[in-house]
Amino acid sequence: MDALELLINRRSASRLAEPAPTGEQLQNILRAGMRAPDHKSMQPWHFFVIEGEGRERFSAVLEQGAIAAGSDDKAIDKARNAPFRAPLIITVVAKCEENHKVPRWEQEMSAGCAVMAMQMAAVAQGFGGIWRSGALTESPVVREAFGCREQDKIVGFLYLGTPQLKASTSINVPDPTPFVTYF
């Protein structure tokens, strides 16, 4: 797939099933994440690969996070079932360090760029994905499960697998004009 076509036609796939990326495919995805823009080569991220029985553990963590937040039964059930939306999930944590030249927000953005790079690498290999976040990224229970320190941030959960719905061949690519000013 042509890189420009991939970027211009990017879209999320919310219904994902087996097979998930494995072996070299998964390594390609992780390597793409490692090449995200990164001021001062700080590599301010950590990737947690969740698959197989790890999804059961992740389910328990999300359920406990929802309970601790005082969520209603419907939200708790949704949290518990979230890891089963896809056969593979990569949780990305921005591991931020104090640096007077690279502020925390920039390190968080680098980790976010890593998520997009990994999603694009998955799509380039024939898989689909969706980047999810939400209130549980801030949950003390979930943060603890991923070893987050006070300065760290869970930037999202990247769900990956084989798309179950065929994407529309006609994509309405927005006109960038209203969003651009030539200065």
Curated annotation (Swiss-Prot):
Superkingdom of origin organism: Bacteria
Cofactor note: Binds 1 FMN per subunit.
EC number(s) reported in the record: 1.-.-.-
Keyword Membrane: no
Positions annotated to bind FMN: 10-12, 35, 39, 131-133
Top class in the EC scheme: oxidoreductase
Keywords associated with the record: Flavoprotein, FMN, NAD, NADP, Oxidoreductase
Any one Gene Ontology cellular component term annotated for this protein: cytosol
Protein residues bound to NAD(+): 121-126
Keyword Flavoprotein among UniProt keywords: yes
Cofactor(s) needed for function: FMN
GO molecular function: FMN binding; oxidoreductase activity; protein homodimerization activity
Matches recorded under Pfam families: Nitroreductase (PF00881)
Subunit text: Homodimer.
Protein family (similarity comment): Belongs to the nitroreductase family.
Protein name per UniProt: Putative NAD(P)H nitroreductase YdjA
Classification of source organism: Bacteria, Pseudomonadati, Pseudomonadota, Gammaproteobacteria, Enterobacterales
